Amino acid sequence: MQLSTFSHSEEELLEKANWLAGFTLGEIAHQLNIDVPLDLRRDKGWVGQLIETALGAKAGSKPEQDFAHLGIELKTIPINHKGFPLETTFVSLAPLTQNIGITWQTSHVRHKLQKVLWIPVQGERHIPVAERHIGQPILWAPSCEQEQQLKNDWEELMEYIIFGRLNEINATLGEVLQLRPKGRNSRSLTAAVNQQGERVQSLPLGFYLRKQFTAEILQNFLRSPL
């Protein structure tokens, strides 16, 4: 299989993703001449970048989808031995300014989640990074019920942002979607607006999918007939 190449169709992309399943991260990294870190403490995004490279994804963390020509976003998801997600999933940065008039239909979150290629990867820390196996890919689009859940949370969370109630935002808000600081450190500040409508500095905020939501996606795939 020729990796790191352009996929002209959804079928071609899925063929590559299915081929990856069962290999270890070390085996794929070796094929791509990429060094494997001893651990992920300083290389948190390494697994995602490796899979992106292997599948020829281009967008990275840009607002567009990883495979924009196919309308597909790529997400690696670390799982434990029971197949349960080990962490929340970053979707996109929240617009802290110039957000008047944005609706769910036009939001980056909806755009990114219209169709997602999930790649489960062993993520338990006792397994050396190079020996972690890649799982079966899941091509997913939200059901009507899931989209309604996402929409409800997004609208609630955006209300806090638009009305400048940034100090009230915490990770407990939202049933399936949450807002959390997204920055390398506490000095990574960006422009925002407070309740008085004044420009202030704030930590960048990102939209994240809760583990229970992504667990449901994985479980639905396992239960679905082949």
Swiss-Prot record:
Cellular location(s):
Cytoplasm
Q: Which Gene3D superfamilies match?
A: DNA mismatch repair MutH/Restriction endonuclease, type II
User: What GO MF annotations does this protein's record show?
Assistant: DNA binding; endonuclease activity
Signal sequence residues: none
CDD domains under this entry? MutH-like (cd00583)
Q: Name the Gene Ontology biological process terms.
A: DNA modification; mismatch repair
**Main role?**
Sequence-specific endonuclease that cleaves unmethylated GATC sequences. It is involved in DNA mismatch repair.
Put simply, this protein is called: DNA mismatch repair protein MutH
Q: What organism does the record attribute this protein to?
A: Actinobacillus pleuropneumoniae serotype 3 (strain JL03)
Gene encoding this polypeptide?
A: mutH
